[in-house]
């Protein structure tokens, strides 16, 4: 299994995001909301939505890099065949300067592992 984050594994189209928001199931913890929906493919695709309220662009981009890296390095434990949208919650925004990558990784992976059809 390759550890790259290829173009086909990204959610890019507005209609894909809207479909997940409309028909997807959700899981959440104190840091993230994860929406997911079966995609009929043999791989999962990831989309990330970070609101401007989260902070300036550098903070938003840093979080998106972290989420992509977590997805990329842990494809083996994330169920295949789903479109996944990750949305950070207010608590993560408030604590972002104090939490490290490993804490964010643990919280996100706990949710991603729970995805099921």
From Swiss-Prot:
Catalytic activity: Endonucleolytic cleavage of RNA, removing 5'-extranucleotides from tRNA precursor
A Pfam family recorded for this sequence: Ribonuclease_P
Cross-referenced PROSITE patterns: RIBONUCLEASE_P
Example of a GO biological process term: tRNA 3'-end processing
Transmembrane feature ranges: none
A cellular-component GO term for this protein: ribonuclease P complex
Family to which the UniProt record says this protein belongs: Belongs to the RnpA family.
Function: RNaseP catalyzes the removal of the 5'-leader sequence from pre-tRNA to produce the mature 5'-terminus. It can also cleave other RNA substrates such as 4.5S RNA. The protein component plays an auxiliary but essential role in vivo by binding to the 5'-leader sequence and broadening the substrate specificity of the ribozyme.
Protein name: Ribonuclease P protein component
Species in which this protein is naturally found: Thermotoga maritima (strain ATCC 43589 / DSM 3109 / JCM 10099 / NBRC 100826 / MSB8)
Gene from which this protein is expressed: rnpA
């Amino acid at each position: 299994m390759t550890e790259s984050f290829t173009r086909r594994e990204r959610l890019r189209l507005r209609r894909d995001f809207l479909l997940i928001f409309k028909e997807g199931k959700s899981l959440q913890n104190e840091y993230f909301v994860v929406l997911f929906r079966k995609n009929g493919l043999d791989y999962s695709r990831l989309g990330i939505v970070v609101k401007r309220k989260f902070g300036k662009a550098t903070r938003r981009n840093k979080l998106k890099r972290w989420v992509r890296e977590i997805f990329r390095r842990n494809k083996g434990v994330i169920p295949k065949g789903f479109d996944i949208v990750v949305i950070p919650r207010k608590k993560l925004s408030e604590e972002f300067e104090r939490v490290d990558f490993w804490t964010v990784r643990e919280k996100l992976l706990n949710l991603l592992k729970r995805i099921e059809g």
